[in-house]
Amino acid sequence: MSLSLKTRRFGRPVRPQLVLLLLFALCLLSVFISAYYLYGWKRGLEPSGSEAQSPDCDEPKISPSRLLPVKPLKPVDSSRTDPLVLVFVESLYSQLGQEIVAILESSRFKYRTEIAPGKGDMPTLTDKDRGRFALIVYENILKYVNLDAWNRELLDKYCVEYGVGIIGFFKANENSLLSAQLKGFPLYLHSNLGLKDCSINPKSPLLYITRPNQVEKGDLPGEDWTVFQSNHSTYEPVLLAKTKSAESIPHLSVDAALHTTVVQDLGLHDGIQRVLFGNNLNFWLHKLVFVDAVSFLTGKRLSLPLNRYVLVDIDDIFVGKEGTRMKVEDVKALYDTQMELRTHIPNFTFNLGFSGKFFHTGTDAEDEGDDLLLSYVKQFWWFPHMWSHMQPHLFHNQSVLAEQMALNRKFAVDHGIPTDMGYAVAPHHSGVYPVHVQLYEAWKQIWGIKVTSTEEYPHLKPARYRRGFVHNGIMILPRQTCGLFTHTIFYNEYPGGPVELDKIINGGELFLTVLLNPISIFMTHLSNYGNDRLGLYTFKLLVQFLNTWTNLKLETLPPVQLAHKYFQIFPEEKDPLWQDPCEDKRHKDIWSKEKTCDRFPKLLIIGPQKTGTTALYLFLGMHSDLSSNYPSSETFEEIQFYNGQNYHKGIDWYMEFFPIPSNTTSDFYFEKSANYFDSELAPRRVAALLPKAKIITILINPADRAYSWYQHQRAHDDPVAIKYTFQEVIKAGPEAPQRLRALQNRCLVPGWYSTHIERWMNHFHANQILVLDGKLLRTEPANVMETVQKFLGVTNAMDYHKTLAFDPKKGFWCQLLDGGKTKCLGKSKGRKYPDMDSDSRSFLMDYYRDHNIELSKLLYKMGQTLPTWLREELQNTR
């Protein structure tokens, strides 16, 4: 009975209001839970609060990760990875991504950028048993944290196996959780903070260049800082700062006076070393620590030594209008500052560039300054500017240019100025690059110049791309600006105010120039050392700042010794890379007006050899709108500029092979050099000088090409070709004599068609390249020439059916002249020789099989028709 009553009580109907209330509560709970997991997972963060607290309230909160056994660190074997940095960016145009790349480029470190995948394919990380990357950088560390399980495991295994570290940045925004745990790590983040007074942890193991003795007083830029907190032994603070306000950070288990803004993960948690930044690179100390992080995580493979060589040039000595020149007190200050700087830079010496014509052309007080400067002549280094400060590219006659230099040299001799420094600078860097041949010759003739410098190679901006090169026996060094120009002579009138100049020096552009370049030549001017003496102020403050914040060892050398040191560090820069002077307005302004870019060819026939390039050269020359180069006395119709030593003769030498353009716009020059095709240097060089050029290559069966080259060498009495049969040549092993292997390479390597065309494709768009069927050029030249004319876009199309005739005696097509006669190629073309033996053909068919398959894929990708011989070869491989 009682059981029955209880049952009836439980079975009473529930009131509708209570049901609705329960449903509403469940909905709220569901929304909260969904937001908790979805939002936290998407951000790669897990909310931090009391629920994350350890059962022991006296102990700072820890993650379950802390309870896992510590994994032993695998020693870094840097020999197993290539010195390449993989940079994952948010987009190709993101500011932080560009700043990361800029530092790597300035340091001349090789890198590869990839859009960071949330899901999808990870770039190939290994090549056989080698790692392709020595360091991974994430612009947004959450893209790493939120990788799908497959790619995350792939990347982490790679980092552990090859000892590769990770650098990551966390940039908070308005949607960031104020306090959260980084998913999967015993690390807590507190975001959107304003910070001040940044200091460096002197115990941080990654510090190399950074000197940890000082505190950067004042507010850090922005209110979106993130600080890191953990009690796991794997995390070591690198930079620390205070909060702007005295309030404690919510959810922070310990009220610390200093908070970690850059943290180093020693790899004790999962075997991977990392460095994490709580903001971007806007703060100058982050740039400095980033450089150290790259060095540390790569075992100093990607690192510059601590030595920095500095040379300060003062151009325009004696030049300048009244009121801008140096007076007696300014000259004394120059000398005193030099002595002061020598306490930090052994033998530091200002390098003075003079134009003697303007001596004693100031006020009386300024003329006295000139006299005092000359009385100190032995205290400084000296170099010649131009006598009258004229730009050398305006002198088209070398003898006139030499006369100007001779006047300056006489002035130097008369006043005891040294004339054997071997260094000179041209006003406005005119004539140095683009090269004015007359300047280089006159410099050597009058002064014996061995070194100069310019800010124009390869371009003025961005400055991090400036390089050196060697031309005509003169070493050219990159020159840097320092924020001072001829018009910046008063501190309070500095553009943007004095704070802008101080910002450039203290952690800004000038500081970074020295930080990221082992050798820096700075351009200043006479006017920077009069009035407020901004030149002295700038370099005293710079040296003080460098000594305070870095372990860099500042040194100096005279210009010639400095040049040798530069090319000892960067030997790969000796070879210049000539560029189109008309593509850069500054270059065009300092290039002789007697020269024109219209004299450059618009078409190159690049080969390869023995495919019909000479025939195409002849056929193109028949067109009234097309003009070929003048023949070379050494290499016949070929200039062979881009692939060998002729390149070092410069673009003036190259242009001499082409006519001076007429006033018509229809001038279309072309050249043919068949060994450009397989040259490793030619594609990059051509693209630099002729970025809009059209490229034509002719392909025949590579086996036939190899055999033709062998027969060509026999006809020219090559002793190796005479001694060995074709089969012996192509089958020669690695132990064969060197000259035999050289002939083998010239027979076989040009036939790697896909390899060579891909190299050209790295520098030219597919629509700039035309691949011709050499077999059709031989049998149906008129039809092929119609294709060529369409490719070139010539307005006056020529009907080659009417201008070409087959010569049965020669066995190929020739130019048809008036009266029915023909003009054919010389007797060296179209030679008859025995057919290739079947064993050799079979060997070469197998040898080139994979190359031909790759060629077919490449031509399909380029949208080009497959040559008839290639279709036949592919059919035979099935």
Swiss-Prot record:
Coiled-coil boundaries: none
GO BP terms in the entry? heparan sulfate proteoglycan biosynthetic process; heparin proteoglycan biosynthetic process
Q: Give the highest taxon in the source lineage.
A: Eukaryota
Disulphide-bonded residues: 814-824
Kindly list the positions annotated as binding adenosine 3',5'-bisphosphate. Answer: 610-614, 708, 813, 829-833
Question: Cytoplasmic side of the membrane: what ranges?
Answer: 1-17
- From the UniProt entry, list the residue stretches annotated as the region Sufficient for localization to Golgi membrane: 1-169
- Pathway(s) it belongs to: Glycan metabolism; heparan sulfate biosynthesis; Glycan metabolism; heparin biosynthesis
Q: Which residues form the active site?
A: 610
Entries under InterPro entries matching the protein: Heparan_SO4_deacetylase_dom (IPR021930), HSNSD_N (IPR056793), NST/OST (IPR037359), P-loop_NTPase (IPR027417), Sulfotransferase_dom (IPR000863)
User: What glycosylation sites does the entry record?
Assistant: 231, 347, 397, 663
Record-level Gene Ontology MF annotations: deacetylase activity; heparan sulfate N-deacetylase activity; heparan sulfate N-sulfotransferase activity
Q: Does the keyword Disulfide bond apply?
A: yes
Q: Give GO cellular component annotations, separated by semicolons.
A: Golgi apparatus; Golgi membrane; trans-Golgi network membrane
Which locations, inside or outside the cell, does it occupy? Golgi apparatus membrane; Golgi apparatus, trans-Golgi network membrane
Q: Where are the transmembrane segments?
A: 18-38
Residues covered by region (Heparan sulfate N-sulfotransferase 1) = 595-878
Ranges for region Heparan sulfate N-deacetylase 1: 40-594
Record field: catalytic activity: alpha-D-glucosaminyl-[heparan sulfate](n) + 3'-phosphoadenylyl sulfate = N-sulfo-alpha-D-glucosaminyl-[heparan sulfate](n) + adenosine 3',5'-bisphosphate + 2 H(+)
> Its membrane topology, per UniProt?
Single-pass type II membrane protein
Describe its assembly. Answer: Monomer.
Protein family (similarity comment): Belongs to the sulfotransferase 1 family. NDST subfamily.
Query: Could you identify this protein by its name?
Result: Bifunctional heparan sulfate N-deacetylase/N-sulfotransferase 1
The protein's organism comes out as: Xenopus laevis (African clawed frog)
